[in-house]
């Protein structure tokens, strides 16, 4: 049975988790979003999100973007290679609709499919 959970074990939480990905990442990017990925030794993928106040001014917009990224990851996580991912949102992400942002995110995830 496929699990569509996004619980605490599927998140990158500590600075060491993020630094592990930043050391030698596999980078996929578009103008609005950058995904850094690195293989892990676990049997599942984990996600970390970085949306800075400098790039997205208002908190409600940052939260909406993070919810969109988490939901997108939750649905496709079983198709991904067992890796740790950090999604970085750029300032140009606010110049397009959330629907288009979700489509671009899906296209970027496809590079990491098994």
Swiss-Prot record:
It catalyses: Endonucleolytic cleavage of RNA, removing 5'-extranucleotides from tRNA precursor. Pfam families: Ribonuclease_P. This is Ribonuclease P protein component. PROSITE patterns: RIBONUCLEASE_P. HAMAP family: RNase_P. GO terms for biological process: tRNA 5'-leader removal. The keyword tRNA processing applies. Keywords: Endonuclease, Hydrolase, Nuclease, RNA-binding, tRNA processing. GO terms for molecular function: 3'-tRNA processing endoribonuclease activity; ribonuclease P activity; tRNA binding. Belongs to the RnpA family. Its EC number is 3.1.26.5. RNaseP catalyzes the removal of the 5'-leader sequence from pre-tRNA to produce the mature 5'-terminus. It can also cleave other RNA substrates such as 4.5S RNA. The protein component plays an auxiliary but essential role in vivo by binding to the 5'-leader sequence and broadening the substrate specificity of the ribozyme. Consists of a catalytic RNA component (M1 or rnpB) and a protein subunit. One of its GO terms (cellular component) is ribonuclease P complex. The keyword Chaperone does not apply.
